[in-house]
Amino acid sequence: MIETIHVNLNNYSYNIYIGEYIFNNMFISSIFLKNKNNVLITNKKIEKKILKNKNQYFYKILNKIHYFSINDGENYKNLYEVEKIISFLLNNLYGRDLNLIALGGGVIGDITGFVASIFQRGVNFFQIPTTLLSQVDASIGGKTGVNHILGKNMIGSFWQPKGVFIDIKFLSTLPKKELLSGIAEIIKYAIVFDKIFFIWLENNLFKVLNLQKKELLYCIKKCCELKVKIIENDEKEIGNRVFLNLGHSFAHAIETFTGYGKWLHGNAVSVGIIMSSYLSFYLKYLKKSELLNIINIFNNIGLPIIGPSTMLPLDYLKLMMRDKKVINKNLRLVIPVSIGKVKLISSIKENILLDSITACQERRFFS
């Protein structure tokens, strides 16, 4: 059975398809086979696993599509890789009737979407996310872009895909650390929107991590539905879509400081959400019991709860001042005020912010 979620964005609407072996479906496979101007963008690792090893299920569809592979990893999410893709497209005489297909995780999706948004002033693209993180978050909503040496995702655009195709069979090829990275974003959705979902996760996260089909499909669908509800009302992040950035200001600081790719994005988000939770506690919003519940859910599943030991609180502040949510040099952060509810705050006193980072690093109240 294939679940379908419609994303209603007027002229930019599309469907998200979720299931197992979804490319066996004639309608879905025809989307990729009927157009001769499809180009699939992937990375070297996926090329080796699926395209060159002739994986029977995926290969029968994907081997019929022209593809181009780039280097794998967050450290390759840059303008150099963008230029390589564009050169490939121009050398092969592709025009504005091109359809790009992103086959990979968040990095491939972000780069492919960005290329689609700028190549000949915009072409269509589709998302086939292959990681848990990209299936529950990164492939949906039209955020595209690349990193700059001074900050993560500083060069980008909003460019909606024409469709998102989520097949859980891809997840069986992932190492546990990649699955855990996706778990962090799943927990984020529960903290931001839904306390009942948070309680469900406390009881079912290990089933999701072990790719048990019923719980996994429920979880992916739930996250997609929550994100779709937000982006339908705030596509360009001028309102409540900013809530999806819970923990990300701290997380992007960690990723920039340590060097892109050294910390998995989900691991950095885990720490970032905990730092945001300490900040909320010290601002007298979040109860201590809920702070500990948040720390526990990340810790129990095996995600990090403290940042890099070499990174000082002032290092976070310096990098966070380049965050996209900064307005008039005023840092704005999303914090949980309770499990299932968040708010955007500004004019944060530096000493409270520094103490919140220190408290996280010291595992304060948590043993």
From Swiss-Prot:
Its EC number is 4.2.3.4. It is an enzyme of class 4 (lyase). GO terms for biological process: amino acid biosynthetic process; aromatic amino acid family biosynthetic process; chorismate biosynthetic process. Keywords: Amino-acid biosynthesis, Aromatic amino acid biosynthesis, Cobalt, Cytoplasm, Lyase, Metal-binding, NAD, Nucleotide-binding, Zinc. GO terms for cellular component: cytoplasm. One of its GO terms (molecular function) is 3-dehydroquinate synthase activity. It is found in: Cytoplasm. It catalyses: 7-phospho-2-dehydro-3-deoxy-D-arabino-heptonate = 3-dehydroquinate + phosphate. Pathway: Metabolic intermediate biosynthesis; chorismate biosynthesis; chorismate from D-erythrose 4-phosphate and phosphoenolpyruvate: step 2/7. Its main location: cytoplasm. NAD(+) binds at residues 72-77, 106-110, 130-131, 143, 152, 170-173. Signal peptide: none annotated. Belongs to the sugar phosphate cyclases superfamily. Dehydroquinate synthase family. Catalyzes the conversion of 3-deoxy-D-arabino-heptulosonate 7-phosphate (DAHP) to dehydroquinate (DHQ). This is 3-dehydroquinate synthase. It comes from Buchnera aphidicola subsp. Cinara cedri (strain Cc). The gene is aroB.
